[in-house]
Amino acid sequence: MSRLIIVFIVVTMICAATALSSKKSINEDEKDEKRSVAVAGAVIEGATLTFNVLQTVLKALGDISRKIAVGIDNESGMTWTAMNTYFRSGTSDVILPHTVPHGKALLYNGQKDRGPVATGVVGVLAYAMSDGNTLAVLFSIPFDYNLYSNWWNVKVYKGHRRADQRMYEELYYNLSPFRGDNGWHNRDLGYGLKGRGFMNSSGQSILEIHVTKA
């Protein structure tokens, strides 16, 4: 009988320790999930994409004169897969989030080249959509506001196409980009989609875009 009691006590202790460990793991996962919010490179719930989230992403870059936080909400009914980012100037230490399901939003950032260099942050990012087409987003934060302004653009290209210099030139010069003027703008993207976006006019800028079904 005493042996059975001892075995019972040992088993109870093991179960309690396992439950405690599982609870700790769950709590840590929850903390990781909370930390992932407002971190460049993360994928968050689309409904939680706000200016405040992007300002947090922007602030994390530190004291940099030219920088941008980008948030793109996927309400397209499709899954997006990252292709690449092309930087005309500037850089990012963050890798594009690989997979962005419907109902989620990606967070990304960019900054001017390091050091005392007179550059802004200008680039294009591309995502392959599950319908076989490509979502492309342009962002342009110049160094010299005496000559240039903030600009952004969004377009769906037929087929899969990586971001490059040619895509940048098309989106910046030829395809009616929007000025970063602290206002919302809308565009029919074709292929049953539409886009709505906002960019401010600051050298420390945010770009928020929502891609939805038309």
Swiss-Prot record:
Residue numbers covered by motif Cell attachment site, crucial for protein stability: 179-181
Instruction: Respond yes or no to whether keyword Signal is given for this record.
Output: yes
Q: Which GO terms of type biological process are on file?
A: cytolysis in another organism; monoatomic cation transport; pore complex assembly
> What residue ranges constitute the propeptide?
20-35
What residues does the record give for site: Important in the initial contact with the lipid membrane? 148
Site label Interacts with the lipid membrane, positions: 179
Q: Which residues bind phosphocholine?
A: 89, 122, 140, 142, 168, 172-173
- Region annotation Trp-rich region, which is important for the binding to lipid membrane: where it falls in the sequence: 140-155
| UniProt region (Plays an important role in the hemolytic activity), positions on chain | 38-47
Protein function? Pore-forming protein that forms cations-selective hydrophilic pores of around 1 nm and causes cytolysis. Pore formation is a multi-step process that involves specific recognition of membrane sphingomyelin (but neither cholesterol nor phosphatidylcholine) using aromatic rich region and adjacent phosphocholine (POC) binding site, firm binding to the membrane (mainly driven by hydrophobic interactions) accompanied by the transfer of the N-terminal region to the lipid-water interface and finally pore formation after oligomerization of monomers.
Q: Give the domain section of the comments.
A: Composed of a long N-terminal alpha-helix and a core region rich in beta-sheet structures. Before the pore formation, the alpha-helix binds the lipid membrane, partitions into the lipid-water interface and stabilizes the monomeric molecule on the membrane. Finally, it traverses the bilayer, thus forming the transmembrane pore.
Which protein family is it in? Belongs to the actinoporin family. Sea anemone subfamily.
> Subunit structure of this entry?
Octamer or nonamer in membranes. Monomer in the soluble state.
Protein name (Swiss-Prot/TrEMBL): DELTA-actitoxin-Aeq1b
Q: Which organism is it from?
A: Actinia equina
